[in-house]
Amino acid sequence: SLFPTRNDTMFIPIRIISNKFIESYMDKIRFKNNMTYFPEQNYKSFLKNKNSKGVFVLLSDVRKPDGDKITFFGLPTTNSGFPAYFSKKENIPIVIIHNEVDENNICHIFIDKVIHPENYKNRHEIMKSILTEYEKIILKLPEQWFWFQDRWRDGI
Protein backbone atom coordinates (compact mmCIF):
# COMPACT_ATOMS: atom_id res chain seq x y z
CA SER A 1 0.00 0.00 0.00
CA LEU A 2 1.12 3.56 -0.66
CA PHE A 3 -0.36 4.78 2.60
CA PRO A 4 1.09 4.29 6.07
CA THR A 5 -0.52 2.37 8.87
CA ARG A 6 0.01 3.16 12.52
CA ASN A 7 2.71 0.48 12.71
CA ASP A 8 4.74 1.65 9.70
CA THR A 9 7.99 3.43 10.39
CA MET A 10 8.24 6.90 8.89
CA PHE A 11 11.63 8.05 7.64
CA ILE A 12 12.00 11.81 7.55
CA PRO A 13 14.86 14.27 7.06
CA ILE A 14 14.55 17.17 9.52
CA ARG A 15 16.15 20.48 10.28
CA ILE A 16 17.25 20.53 13.91
CA ILE A 17 15.61 23.46 15.69
CA SER A 18 17.93 25.61 17.81
CA ASN A 19 15.28 26.08 20.53
CA LYS A 20 15.98 23.15 22.86
CA PHE A 21 12.45 23.15 24.33
CA ILE A 22 10.76 22.92 20.93
CA GLU A 23 13.28 20.35 19.69
CA SER A 24 12.67 18.23 22.82
CA TYR A 25 8.91 18.41 22.20
CA MET A 26 9.39 17.46 18.53
CA ASP A 27 11.55 14.49 19.59
CA LYS A 28 8.70 13.22 21.77
CA ILE A 29 6.28 13.52 18.86
CA ARG A 30 8.69 11.72 16.51
CA PHE A 31 9.18 8.89 19.01
CA LYS A 32 5.44 8.56 19.69
CA ASN A 33 4.71 8.39 15.94
CA ASN A 34 7.41 5.85 15.09
CA MET A 35 9.53 8.30 13.08
CA THR A 36 13.15 7.64 12.23
CA TYR A 37 14.72 10.97 11.41
CA PHE A 38 17.95 12.28 9.94
CA PRO A 39 19.49 15.75 9.81
CA GLU A 40 18.49 17.16 6.42
CA GLN A 41 22.10 17.27 5.23
CA ASN A 42 22.61 13.57 5.94
CA TYR A 43 20.82 11.99 2.98
CA LYS A 44 23.31 9.08 2.94
CA SER A 45 21.82 7.81 6.22
CA PHE A 46 18.35 8.39 4.84
CA LEU A 47 19.14 6.39 1.69
CA LYS A 48 20.54 3.48 3.73
CA ASN A 49 16.94 2.81 4.77
CA LYS A 50 15.52 2.83 1.24
CA ASN A 51 14.72 -0.90 1.32
CA SER A 52 13.08 -0.73 4.73
CA LYS A 53 9.38 -1.25 5.17
CA GLY A 54 7.89 2.12 5.90
CA VAL A 55 7.01 5.51 4.52
CA PHE A 56 9.48 8.17 3.40
CA VAL A 57 8.30 11.67 4.25
CA LEU A 58 9.84 14.40 2.11
CA LEU A 59 8.84 18.05 2.04
CA SER A 60 8.95 19.61 -1.40
CA ASP A 61 8.00 23.24 -0.80
CA VAL A 62 11.34 24.19 0.67
CA ARG A 63 13.51 26.88 -0.88
CA LYS A 64 17.13 25.79 -1.20
CA PRO A 65 19.52 28.56 -2.24
CA ASP A 66 21.71 26.09 -4.11
CA GLY A 67 18.80 23.94 -5.33
CA ASP A 68 17.23 23.38 -8.72
CA LYS A 69 16.00 26.48 -10.52
CA ILE A 70 12.23 26.25 -10.93
CA THR A 71 9.18 28.41 -11.54
CA PHE A 72 6.61 28.67 -8.76
CA PHE A 73 3.53 30.86 -9.24
CA GLY A 74 5.13 32.18 -12.40
CA LEU A 75 8.25 33.45 -10.64
CA PRO A 76 11.75 31.98 -10.64
CA THR A 77 13.01 30.44 -7.40
CA THR A 78 14.93 27.39 -6.23
CA ASN A 79 13.79 24.12 -4.73
CA SER A 80 15.15 20.89 -3.33
CA GLY A 81 14.76 18.36 -6.11
CA PHE A 82 15.49 15.48 -3.73
CA PRO A 83 11.93 14.06 -3.54
CA ALA A 84 11.79 13.81 -7.34
CA TYR A 85 15.35 12.47 -7.53
CA PHE A 86 14.62 9.80 -4.89
CA SER A 87 11.32 8.85 -6.54
CA LYS A 88 12.85 8.51 -10.01
CA LYS A 89 16.01 6.72 -8.86
CA GLU A 90 14.18 4.18 -6.69
CA ASN A 91 10.95 4.03 -8.72
CA ILE A 92 8.89 4.97 -5.66
CA PRO A 93 5.58 6.84 -6.12
CA ILE A 94 5.11 10.25 -4.53
CA VAL A 95 1.84 10.82 -2.68
CA ILE A 96 0.98 14.50 -2.46
CA ILE A 97 -1.05 15.32 0.62
CA HIS A 98 -2.12 18.47 2.39
CA ASN A 99 -4.18 19.37 5.41
CA GLU A 100 -6.93 21.92 5.95
CA VAL A 101 -8.29 23.23 9.22
CA ASP A 102 -12.06 23.73 9.27
CA GLU A 103 -14.14 26.33 11.14
CA ASN A 104 -14.25 24.00 14.19
CA ASN A 105 -10.45 23.87 14.26
CA ILE A 106 -10.43 20.24 13.09
CA CYS A 107 -7.61 19.23 10.78
CA HIS A 108 -8.52 17.17 7.70
CA ILE A 109 -5.88 15.45 5.58
CA PHE A 110 -6.40 15.14 1.82
CA ILE A 111 -4.62 12.95 -0.68
CA ASP A 112 -4.28 15.10 -3.78
CA LYS A 113 -2.35 13.06 -6.29
CA VAL A 114 -0.12 10.02 -6.65
CA ILE A 115 2.83 10.64 -8.96
CA HIS A 116 4.26 7.53 -10.56
CA PRO A 117 7.87 8.26 -11.61
CA GLU A 118 7.74 5.90 -14.59
CA ASN A 119 5.29 8.35 -16.24
CA TYR A 120 7.92 11.12 -16.33
CA LYS A 121 11.12 11.51 -18.34
CA ASN A 122 13.19 12.99 -15.53
CA ARG A 123 13.13 14.42 -12.01
CA HIS A 124 12.58 17.98 -13.30
CA GLU A 125 9.24 16.94 -14.82
CA ILE A 126 8.30 15.28 -11.53
CA MET A 127 9.11 18.45 -9.55
CA LYS A 128 7.10 20.54 -12.02
CA SER A 129 4.12 18.23 -11.45
CA ILE A 130 4.51 18.44 -7.66
CA LEU A 131 4.68 22.23 -7.68
CA THR A 132 1.71 22.52 -10.04
CA GLU A 133 -0.30 20.55 -7.47
CA TYR A 134 0.97 22.81 -4.67
CA GLU A 135 -0.14 25.89 -6.60
CA LYS A 136 -3.70 24.47 -6.83
CA ILE A 137 -3.73 23.62 -3.12
CA ILE A 138 -2.39 27.03 -2.08
CA LEU A 139 -4.81 28.97 -4.30
CA LYS A 140 -7.73 27.12 -2.71
CA LEU A 141 -6.87 28.26 0.86
CA PRO A 142 -3.84 30.59 0.81
CA GLU A 143 -4.41 31.70 4.40
CA GLN A 144 -3.65 28.16 5.59
CA TRP A 145 -0.35 27.77 3.78
CA PHE A 146 2.93 28.10 5.66
CA TRP A 147 5.02 30.55 3.62
CA PHE A 148 8.75 30.94 3.73
CA GLN A 149 9.56 34.64 3.72
CA ASP A 150 12.49 34.25 1.37
CA ARG A 151 10.75 32.12 -1.28
CA TRP A 152 11.69 34.50 -4.12
CA ARG A 153 14.76 36.11 -2.60
CA ASP A 154 17.53 37.32 -4.90
CA GLY A 155 15.32 37.22 -8.01
CA ILE A 156 17.11 33.97 -9.02
Residues covered by each model-derived region:
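Catalytic core of membrane glycerolipid acyltransferases/transacylases, capturing the structured
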Residues: 1-41, 65-70, 75-76
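Non-catalytic C-terminal accessory region of glycerolipid acyltransferases
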Residues: 6-9, 44-156
